Curated annotation (Swiss-Prot):
This is Small ribosomal subunit protein bS20. It holds the Pfam family Ribosomal_S20p. One of its GO terms (cellular component) is small ribosomal subunit. One of its GO terms (molecular function) is small ribosomal subunit rRNA binding. Keywords: Ribonucleoprotein, Ribosomal protein, RNA-binding, rRNA-binding. The keyword Nucleotidyltransferase does not apply. Binds directly to 16S ribosomal RNA. GO terms for biological process: translation. Residues 1-20 are annotated as: Disordered.
Amino acid sequence: MANTKSAKKRIRSDARKRLRNQSYRSRVKTMIKKAELALANGIVDEAALRAAYSTLDKAAVKGIIHKNNAARRKSRLAQKAKKVALAAQAGSAA
């Protein structure tokens, strides 16, 4: 257990930061799920994708996730969106 005053304060501040980070990480997951759900239904929802990209970028800037983690997730979302768009285009052309 913490013995010094500064160590006790660090524990309190770490708890606040952990809650804030947890909340933001949850928001990131929610935005990604919304975008993926739309893609799974065959809809390229630009607004949902834009919101997911924005949330991922903000989380990376704030240090909640690593920038490469954000880039990888954005890339995978973009790949799925492209796949759905091409499938829809091929379906309408046929």
